[in-house]
């Protein structure tokens, strides 16, 4: 059976991006002729969850932001291939492309590896937030590859909430009322996106055996006297439960999708999100972060 491929691209008016799309489309047209694959192209702004159902491969063209936003629609059964359309290697104004395993120059060879099972399959965990409303409805927020923010929708106002977490072996049971700038949660692979920019973590490393089950937590700009272990920062596998005392709050997944809640809602954050099968071709994602792993 021929492969069914969805290509999602970042829509802009940059010539470098247009050239990348031309190279990608040309390579795929050859595979349509030689292998009989089926392809569909759609802009990020037009894509729907239903577009991803039944696909054998999803190709995301753009940068890390494009990939993390699109990955929210992809379940655990569909491999994703990222193509950096404007690599920083070629232009200092380009994209770093941390999650992007391919580029226009290597795409023709890489996509064949992906179809033939020769790519590196990075099986990555994702954060999941579940909101229970005051009327008992349950809302699952989009899974986050990098990070989740839970805060007041008005960033100039403090976030008021109750924070709870069971003992995790490092910290005892947590049950605290806090006023902060919101709570940030990060996966191990996502900590470089935002978390390390607001936390002092110089030299901190993590056990390799815990990176699939644990996540990072911080209460942003928490008062100094409240910065107790586990309440201010944590590296934990236990779910965190937040009970809102805010008129309006929201969960933001990877800086993209927002899910709103009101006072009295509970938000449970854990590593129970669907895993993401991200394909790379020259190195594993985890190899890029070896300096943050205990040896």
Please identify what each model-predicted range represents:
Residues 1-79, 114-119:
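N-terminal glycine-/serine-/threonine-rich phosphate-binding loop
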Residues 22-24, 74-76, 199-204, 231-234, ...:
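Short, solvent-exposed amphipathic alpha-helical segments in soluble enzyme
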Residues 50-53, 72-75, 119-122, 137-142, ...:
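Solvent-exposed alpha-helices and their adjacent loops that cap or buttress functional pockets
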Residues 63-66, 86, 188-192:
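Short glycine-rich anion-binding loops that position phosphate/pyrophosphate groups of nucleotides
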Residues 77-89:
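Beta-strand-loop-alpha-helix segment that lines the small-molecule cofactor/substrate pocket
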Residues 86-183:
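Catalytic core of DAGKc-family lipid kinases
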Residues 150, 167-170, 226-295:
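ATP/nucleoside-binding phosphotransfer catalytic cores, i.e., glycine-rich phosphate-binding loops
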Residues 173-225:
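Gly/Ser/Thr-rich active-site loops/lids in small-molecule metabolic enzymes
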